[in-house]
Amino acid sequence: MGDAPSPEEKLHLITRNLQEVLGEEKLKEILKERELKVYWGTATTGKPHVAYFVPMSKIADFLKAGCEVTILFADLHAYLDNMKAPWELLELRTSYYENVIKAMLESIGVPLEKLKFIKGTDYQLSKEYTLDVYRLSSVVTQHDAKKAGAEVVKQVEHPLLSGLLYPGLQALDEEYLKVDAQFGGVDQRKIFTFAEKYLPALGYSKRVHLMNPMVPGLTGSKMSSSEEESKIDLLDRKEDVKKKLKKAFCEPGNVENNGVLSFIKHVLFPLKSEFVILRDEKWGGNKTYTVYLELEKDFAAEVVHPGDLKNSVEVALNKLLDPIREKFNTPALKKLASAAYPDPSKQKPPAKGPAKNSEPEEVIPSRLDIRVGKILSVEKHPDADSLYVEKIDVGEAEPRTVVSGLVQFVPKEELQDRLVVVLCNLKPQKMRGVDSQGMLLCASVEGVSRQVEPLDPPAGSAPGERVFVQGYEKGQPDEELKPKKKVFEKLQADFKISEECIAQWKQTNFMTKLGFVSCKSLKGGNIS
């Protein structure tokens, strides 16, 4: 059996791959005297996704460093955060979290017997804790409470009082769990500094705070439980993992906001200390990297292709997910998963008839599912001389068939392999016997001779990337636009091409995360 790690080695294990440590000198002093007591808490809201492997890998580091580790399932916090977890589902979601987090830890070889698991409501409803909540509320300003939760608590126009209580409860958890340190994402920083300011006001000591970086989602932004395309669920099927990775932003040579590279850096490398790029012999064969920066350097130099990177991540990720899928393949856990996260489409529909005081539906651009597409093939419609039948990759498992009236305006060879902009949530429509599963959006100018140009997404775009109107990127598109409600038609009335050839809605630009959607030359044109 090897020697116990020295205080310096423990410090290295505890702090490696962290973005920031608050209270490092205090941490060093504790490690000279005894083992560190640390906790990680997770509010039991949306389904945990693969980015949760980041804290799991750090928990493995803490155990290697001899730390006493507590995992808190913060059920009360989940309810306080704008009721992200309804009260009637709170117990079910907490049970789901406990089972899935334990399955994750087992899949990376973490011994569960060395961990302490606790629910927030096991102690947060006690007389002593409740009294401290009141004591804290007497010294905390509304401004500080709101500021502390800004990165974590859901921000709404008229915030509930519960969201202002959230940071205070998280601060008190440090005292009631009797720990030296709290570990969390860097998005928790304002809550951590809030705790450092206010716990001493109650006579409690200031704790050490350890922060890991936030892993970008597959779309390049923060990986989020509420943004479906940005994350891979722990129970996603292999085909879903493949589909989501295929749509992930991973531009050749671009290492900025690259969710695929970031996942390798913060999850796969810490767990395995190496990463293997799988590729055909004709492209150089497999290559093993033991230093992440070497892989990043090769990707930046385009020695490693995005396709090979994604395929290699897919294989490595499925090895982590297989034990979790297997564990949840039992009747009891399948029932738990469906009960904790009921399918909204299967909920009981509201009673027929107009609801009293119902508000009209908002007609806003985020209701449109517009995506970057790549035309894989173009053929003349067999029964219509003016129509093309295109197969377009829009980031799904199979390409979509789209019929468009471009024969008179755009040569076939200009469309082949072209990146285009496709409206994907129109109701499929038969066009001269062929089902069209989308609309290829184009700019047009009427006149003596009508001119039409397909809209162009920014250079470097990938099929499946979302196209949105600036300022409306957060909303979820309708599953399918209902023809009778004419949502697209109402919005289209304000579509226009600017003098700079940028596609706009009410003078606000259409864009992707890489830049603006444009056309070649039709200034002032319409969009259809």
Swiss-Prot record:
L-tyrosine binds at residues 39, 166, 170, 173, 188. The modification Phosphoserine is found at residues 205, 386. A motif (Nuclear localization signal) lies at residues 242-247. Gene3D superfamilies: HUPs (3.40.50.620), Nucleic acid-binding proteins (2.40.50.140), Tyrosyl-Transfer RNA Synthetase (1.10.240.10). A motif ('KMSKS' region) lies at residues 222-226. The keyword Transcription does not apply. PROSITE patterns: TRBD. Its main location: cytoplasm. GO terms for biological process: response to starvation; tyrosyl-tRNA aminoacylation. The keyword Metal-binding does not apply. Residues 339-363 are annotated as: Disordered. A motif ('HIGH' region) lies at residues 44-52. InterPro entries: aa-tRNA-synth_Ic, NA-bd_OB-fold, Rossmann-like_a/b/a_fold, tRNA-bd_dom, Tyr-tRNA-ligase, Tyrosine-tRNA_ligase_regulator. Its EC number is 6.1.1.1. It is an enzyme of class 6 (ligase). It is found in: Cytoplasm; Nucleus. The modification N6-acetyllysine is found at residues 197, 206, 474, 482, 490. Trans-resveratrol binds at residues 39, 170, 173. Belongs to the class-I aminoacyl-tRNA synthetase family. Homodimer. Interacts (when binding to resveratrol) with PARP1; interaction stimulates the poly-ADP-ribosyltransferase activity of PARP1. Tyrosine--tRNA ligase that catalyzes the attachment of tyrosine to tRNA(Tyr) in a two-step reaction: tyrosine is first activated by ATP to form Tyr-AMP and then transferred to the acceptor end of tRNA(Tyr). Also acts as a positive regulator of poly-ADP-ribosylation in the nucleus, independently of its tyrosine--tRNA ligase activity. Activity is switched upon resveratrol-binding: resveratrol strongly inhibits the tyrosine--tRNA ligase activity and promotes relocalization to the nucleus, where YARS1 specifically stimulates the poly-ADP-ribosyltransferase activity of PARP1. The nuclear localization signal, which mediates localization to the nucleus, is also important for interacting with tRNA(Tyr), suggesting that it is sterically blocked when tRNA(Tyr) is bound. This is Tyrosine--tRNA ligase, cytoplasmic. It comes from Mus musculus. The gene is Yars1.
